[in-house]
């Protein structure tokens, strides 16, 4: 499929994909650091996978509350995991670290008119630290990520892979795969630290490949194989991460899974704050329930 794409749009997409693949290994979390977090015991003194996952769910709630793009959330998770995989963060500082990463991502991705004031962000997040605390932590985060805020994320690959597959479909079949569903699935994966150990391209292709299987879009199977080959993704790696994604989505769709809670954010905004906030702050985008997937 990749070899026969001849339209101008397709060539542009392919050029973007090649650029992302070239940059992919830069600005990613240290896998060894993530493993240390995963192996840490929950004694209240050390960062654990559970605490990290809860923090990411809070960032997802904020993303939905403000109506920010998935790209913003994906970048915030990248920044958070890059920082956590380098630094020994005490649990009591995690909220400030997480919100700092989130604010950096918001200012990097969102339009300036949609960027909230730091005071509003702290209040809505229900934290007790000050704007000065947030700004100091922001500087620390920037220093530890070498001032490289922009990073290659799984969301960027998800967009490009999806667009390239769409180019290969007849017009009447282009709605067979829903991009919003893919976004929702990626958000669920971001809420598990294990997926930050996957290469962004592998995670994105795993999500799309599973959805194609679930929707029985056999005409796209060859397209997935071509994208896998072009991206130089090992078949065993793809299968390994597909199985983990499938397990994650199955658990996410069950009642046992703790889902992001946007409702708690809605209720704490006072009348005075509400009058000061922009209308776009109430544009809540709920994360849809993901039906159980068949491995």
Swiss-Prot record:
Record's note on what induces expression: Activated in breast and prostate cancer cells. Activated by actinomycin-D induced DNA damage.
Q: Where are the transmembrane segments?
A: none
Listed disulfide bonds for this chain? none
What's one GO MF term for it? cyclin-dependent protein serine/threonine kinase regulator activity
Keywords recorded for this protein, A-Z:
Cell cycle, Cell division, Cyclin, Mitosis, Nucleus
Which InterPro entries does the UniProt entry name for this protein? Cyclin, Cyclin-like_dom, Cyclin-like_sf, Cyclin_N
A GO cellular component annotated for this chain's UniProt record is: nucleoplasm
**Which PANTHER family does this one have?**
CYCLINS (PTHR10177)
By sequence similarity, the record places it as follows: Belongs to the cyclin family. Cyclin G subfamily.
> In its UniProt entry, what is this protein called?
Cyclin-G1
Q: Which organism is it from?
A: Homo sapiens (Human)
The organism's taxonomic lineage, starting at the top: Eukaryota, Metazoa, Chordata, Craniata, Vertebrata
